[in-house]
A protein has these predicted regions:
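Conserved NTP-donor binding/palm subdomain of two-metal-ion nucleotidyltransferases/polymerases, i.e.
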Residues: 2-139, 145-237
Length: 237
C-alpha cells in the first residue's frame, strides 16, 4: 500500500483539525493502540510531529512511536531520528536517576518516622504501559508524608550546645521536619509552607516538595470531603 503524505494529497497543510488527528494517531501508535498512521509522512510532517512532542513534553513517548512506525516501513528522516533518539536516551537516564532518588528519599523519611507516598510524575509511572514508563518526561519529586500518630520529635535551635526536641503532630510535624532538613544541610532558608506542601532540600539538583495534603479542591465543601477521604485512607498507601 502506498503511503500518502499529509503535506500533499491526503490532508491539507492548513487544516489544523486534520493535523491534530495525525498527532493523536501518532500517540496511539506509541501506546500500542494503533499499528500505523492513516497517511504517510514527508519530512515536514515528521518535523511537525517532533515539534508537537517537544511542546507537549512527549519527546520520549513520541520516540516509541518512531520506533514502531520504522518497523512497519514508515521511516523518520535519519538526522531527525538520531536527534530524537538522543533526547529519548537522556530522558531514560533522567528517569532512572529520579527513581533511585525517590527510593532513597522515601527510605530516609520512613526511617525518620514518616510514612511516604510518591505523587504525580514518578508516582504515576505504574499507570503507563511498561515500555513507556522510562520515557515519560521527568520533573521534580513530590512526596506525600504522613507522621506517626504519636508525632515526631524535632530538634530545635536553642542558642547553646544542648540539643532539645519538641514533639510535633499532624501537619506541623511534616512542616517542621522539612525545615529541619534545611538546617541539617546547612542551608540558611526558612521554607514557606502553603496550604498543601512545603519545599524540602533538593537532591543533586532535583527539586523536592513535601506534601501534607496530596491535593485540594477550590470548593470548600468538596475539599473538606476530599481531605477527610485522604485522612481515612492515608495509611492504605
Amino acid at each position: 500500500m502506498s503511503m500518502r503524505s499529509i503535506s500533499s494529497g491526503c490532508w491539507s497543510r492548513n487544516d489544523n483539525w486534520l493535523y491534530m488527528t495525525l498527532f493523536f494517531e501518532f500517540l496511539q501508535v506509541a501506546m500500542g493502540n494503533r499499528k500505523s498512521l492513516s497517511c504517510g509522512n514527508k519530512d515536514a510532517d515528521w518535523q511537525r510531529l517532533f515539534d508537537f512532542c517537544k511542546r507537549q513534553a512527549l519527546i520520549g513517548v513520541g520516540f516509541t512511536a518512531v520506533e514502531k512506525l520504522h518497523a512497519v516501513g514508515v521511516v523518520c528522516p535519519a538526522a531527525l531520528r538520531m536527534q530524537w533518539m538522543a533526547l529519548a536516551l537522556q530522558i531514560e537516564k533522567r528517569n532512572g536517576l529520579l527513581n533511585q532518588q525517590c527510593s532513597h528519599l522515601a527510605g530516609r523519611y520512613e526511617h525518620d518516622g514518616l510514612s511516604t507516598c510518591i505523587l504525580k510524575g514518578q508516582g504515576n509511572l505504574l499507570n503507563y504501559p511498561e515500555e513507556l514508563r522510562i520515557r515519560r518526561m521527568p520533573g521534580d519529586i513530590d512526596v506525600w508524608c504522613i507522621p506517626q500518630k504519636d508525632g515526631l520529635d524535632i530538634a530545635v535551635a536553642t542558642g547553646n550546645k544542648n540539643v532539645e526536641y519538641v514533639n510535633y503532630r499532624g501537619v506541623n510535624a511534616v512542616i517542621e521536619y522539612a525545615r529541619m532538613q534545611f538546617r541539617l544541610c546547612g542551608i540558611d532558608k526558612q521554607p514557606r509552607a502553603i496550604y498543601h506542601h512545603i519545599d524540602a532540600p533538593s537532591i543533586d539538583g532535583t527539586e523536592v516538595e513535601i506534601h501534607y495534603k496530596p491535593s485540594f479542591c477550590r470548593s470548600l465543601i468538596r475539599n473538606r470531603r476530599m481531605q477527610k477521604w485522604f485522612a481515612d485512607h492515608a495509611y492504605e498507601c
